[in-house]
C-alpha cells in the first residue's frame, strides 16, 4: 500500500515498456497489411493528396496532367491488392495535346522533326529549288492554357527573282529588254568593237545566272583594251605563243641558249593590267646553283639541336660499351685466377703436398 500523501500511478512504470511495445507491434501489423504510396506517371497525376499508406481494397484515381487528354476506355485508377501491391495501371489512356495540322507550303515542304504534332515538338520548313523562305524556318508546338498551338504563323515560299544585271561600258549582255529574271536565267556579255586598232577584251565571267537569294552568280565583267609589251629574253628564245601583238591571256614560253640557265618562269601570261605574269624571265650565263640540301633549309637552332642529340647519343653508346668491356675484363681476370690456382695444385708433387 502506498504511503499516505502519495498518489499511486495508474500505469506502473514496469508495465509501460510492455504497453509501448504492444502498441508498436499493433501499428506495424497495420502497416504490413497496407500499400505504400501509389505509382507516379508522366502523363497523369493522383487526384487528391497521397497518404503514407493505404488499406487493402482501397482505390485511388488519377487524372490526365495539363497538356494531356483522356481517351476511354482504359482505366485511370488502381486498387491496393491483398499482396500489398497496387494493381497494374498505366498512363496510356492520357494522350498529349496536339497542335493543328500544318500542310506543306506551296512550293515547299513541312517536315515533322519527331513525326508528331504533339506539344513540345517542332516542325521544320524548306522551300523547293528556285524558291526562298519568308517567315519562320521552325515552329514549336506550345501549350496555351490547356490547348496546344503553334508558336507562330507558317512561312511561305517565294519565287527567286533577280533584277536585270548591270550594264557595262564598251559592252552589252543578252536579254537586255527583260525586266525580271527567274531562278537560273542566264545572260551572256560581249564587248563592242573597239574604235582603235586593238580590240576590247572581256575581263571576268562572260555568262552569269540568277542564283539563290535573288543574287547574280558573279559580278559583271568589264571590257577594256589589254595589250602586253613584246617579251624579249636576251640569250634565250621564244618557243611558243608567237605573235606580233599580245592581248589578254596570251601565253608565251621560253628557253635559254646553250651555256645559259633560266632565272624565273619559262611560261608567262598577259594579265588584265597589260603586264606579264609572272614577269619576263632572264637567261644568266653558267649553270644554275645546286638545290640547297636538307641542312641548308633548316634554321640554326634546329641544326644545333640535331648536333647535340647526335653527341649525346654517341656518348651514351660509348658509356654502355665501356661498361660492357669492363665487366668482360673483370670476369676474365676472375676466370684466369681460378685456372692458375688449379694449375698450381695439379703441378705440385705428392711429397710437396704432404710437406
From Swiss-Prot:
CDD domains linked to this entry: CCP
Entry's Gene Ontology cellular component terms: cell surface; inner acrosomal membrane
Disulphide-bonded residues: 99-141, 127-157, 162-210, 191-223, 228-270, 256-283
Annotated localization: Cytoplasmic vesicle, Secretory vesicle, Acrosome inner membrane
Membrane topology of the entry: Single-pass type I membrane protein
InterPro entries: CD46, SEZ6_CSMD_C4BPB_Regulators, Sushi/SCR/CCP_sf, Sushi_SCR_CCP_dom
Protein's UniProt name: Membrane cofactor protein
Amino acid at each position: 500500500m502506498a504511503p499516505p500523501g502519495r498518489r499511486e500511478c495508474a500505469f506502473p512504470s514496469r508495465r509501460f515498456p510492455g504497453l509501448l511495445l504492444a502498441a508498436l507491434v499493433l501499428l506495424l501489423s497495420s502497416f504490413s497489411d497496407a500499400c505504400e504510396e501509389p505509382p507516379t506517371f508522366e502523363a497523369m497525376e493522383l487526384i487528391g493528396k497521397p497518404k503514407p499508406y493505404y488499406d487493402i481494397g482501397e482505390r485511388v484515381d488519377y487524372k490526365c496532367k495539363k497538356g494531356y487528354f483522356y481517351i476511354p476506355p482504359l482505366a485511370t485508377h488502381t486498387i491496393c491488392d491483398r499482396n500489398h501491391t497496387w494493381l497494374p495501371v498505366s498512363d496510356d489512356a492520357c494522350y498529349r495535346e496536339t497542335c493543328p495540322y500544318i500542310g506543306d507550303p506551296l512550293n515547299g515542304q513541312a517536315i515533322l522533326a519527331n513525326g508528331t504534332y504533339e506539344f513540345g515538338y517542332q516542325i521544320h520548313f524548306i522551300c523547293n529549288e528556285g524558291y526562298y523562305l519568308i517567315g519562320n524556318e521552325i515552329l514549336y508546338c506550345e501549350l496555351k492554357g490547356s490547348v496546344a498551338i503553334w508558336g507562330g504563323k507558317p512561312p511561305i515560299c517565294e519565287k527567286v527573282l533577280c533584277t536585270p544585271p548591270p550594264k557595262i561600258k564598251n559592252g552589252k549582255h543578252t536579254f537586255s529588254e527583260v525586266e525580271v529574271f527567274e531562278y537560273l536565267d542566264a545572260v551572256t556579255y560581249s564587248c563592242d568593237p573597239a574604235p582603235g586598232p586593238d580590240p576590247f577584251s572581256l575581263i571576268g565571267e562572260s555568262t552569269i545566272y540568277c542564283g539563290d537569294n535573288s543574287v547574280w552568280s558573279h559580278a559583271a565583267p568589264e571590257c577594256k583594251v589589254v595589250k602586253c609589251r613584246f617579251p624579249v629574253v636576251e640569250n634565250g628564245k621564244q618557243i611558243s605563243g608567237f605573235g606580233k601583238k599580245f592581248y589578254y591571256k596570251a601565253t608565251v614560253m621560253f628557253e635559254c641558249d646553250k651555256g645559259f640557265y633560266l632565272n624565273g618562269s619559262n611560261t608567262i601570261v598577259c594579265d588584265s593590267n597589260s603586264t606579264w605574269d609572272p614577269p619576263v624571265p632572264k637567261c644568266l650565263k653558267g649553270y644554275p646553283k645546286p638545290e640547297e640540301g636538307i641542312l641548308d633549309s633548316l634554321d640554326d637552332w634546329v641544326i644545333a639541336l640535331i648536333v647535340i642529340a647526335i653527341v649525346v647519343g654517341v656518348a651514351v653508346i660509348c658509356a654502355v660499351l665501356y661498361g660492357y668491356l669492363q665487366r668482360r675484363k673483370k670476369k676474365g681476370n676472375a676466370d684466369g685466377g681460378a685456372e692458375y690456382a688449379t694449375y698450381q695444385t695439379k703441378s705440385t708433387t705428392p711429397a710437396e703436398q704432404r710437406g
